[in-house]
Design a protein with these regions (language model features):
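Conserved phosphate/anionic-ligand binding catalytic regions in large, soluble enzymes, centered on
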Residues: 141-149, 180-184
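Metal-assisted phosphate- and nucleotidyl-transfer catalytic regions
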Residues: 29-138, 161-181
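A generic structural motif
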Residues: 11-22, 139-141
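Hydrophobic (often cysteine-bearing) scaffold residues that line and stabilize catalytic clefts
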Residues: 23-27, 63, 151
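Short helix/loop capping segments that flank catalytic or ligand/cofactor-binding pockets
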Residues: 1, 21, 116-119, 144
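Class II aminoacyl-tRNA synthetase-like tRNA-binding/catalytic domains
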Residues: 1-17, 174-180
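Glycine-rich, acidic/polar active-site loops that bind/position phosphate-bearing ligands
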Residues: 19-22, 26, 35
Length: 184
């Protein structure tokens, strides 16, 4: 179930955000709505599949480096990947969220910028970290999101820092040049 060659997905973009936390709040609200709808309108299908729909109250949030520290201190797991979460770490983090918060979901934020796409905004307080997140559920990453760069010069600087040819992204960066609102 980890990698599928075909799947259906849902992407959404939000403009005029203050931070990535606005995107996370919207995602949490959408998940609550979808789960409630499925519970109310699909009981026969749920019974047929022997599936349970999780209860979503609040979704705990943990920073990437804090998550790595907890996995080592609480579970004795020494990570070999300093830029991302391995599958076993995703399972452990979901176990931690269930034990500590009674939640089957957990947001992991502030991944190393080097791991995130060129359009992910870096944290002004620590530019080595991106203002981005993954949402984990029952041991699997189910979404990725974050705040995107909206400033033209900031986007051009990040492309240059990553030694990417800005000309190849001209149609993308043109939007920034003429005015892009804060978005995620």
């Amino acid at each position: 179930s980890r990698h599928l060659n075909e799947y259906m997905g849902l992407d959404f973009e939000m403009a005029y955000i203050d931070s990535m936390y606005d995107v996370m709040a919207m995602e949490t609200g959408m998940l609550k709505s979808v789960m409630n709808y499925v519970k109310e309108h699909c009981p026969e299908e749920l019974a047929l599949l022997k599936a349970d729909v999780p209860e979503i109250k609040e979704i705990p949030t943990i920073r990437f480096h804090e998550a790595k520290k907890i996995m080592e201190e609480k579970y004795g797991h020494k990570s070999k990947n300093r830029y991302d979460l391995n599958p076993d770490e995703e399972v452990l983090l979901c176990q931690w969220a269930k034990e500590e918060y009674g939640s089957e979901f957990v947001f992991v934020t502030h991944f190393p910028s080097a791991k995130r796409p060129f359009y992910a905004m870096d944290d002004k307080d620590d530019p080595k970290l991106a203002l981005s997140f993954d949402l984990l559920f029952r041991g699997l990453e189910i979404t990725t999101g974050g705040q995107r760069i909206h400033d033209y010069q900031e986007q051009m600087d990040k492309l240059a820092a990553r030694k990417m040819n800005a000309e190849l992204f001209e149609s993308f960066t043109m939007l920034h040049k003429y005015g892009m609102p804060p978005h995620g």
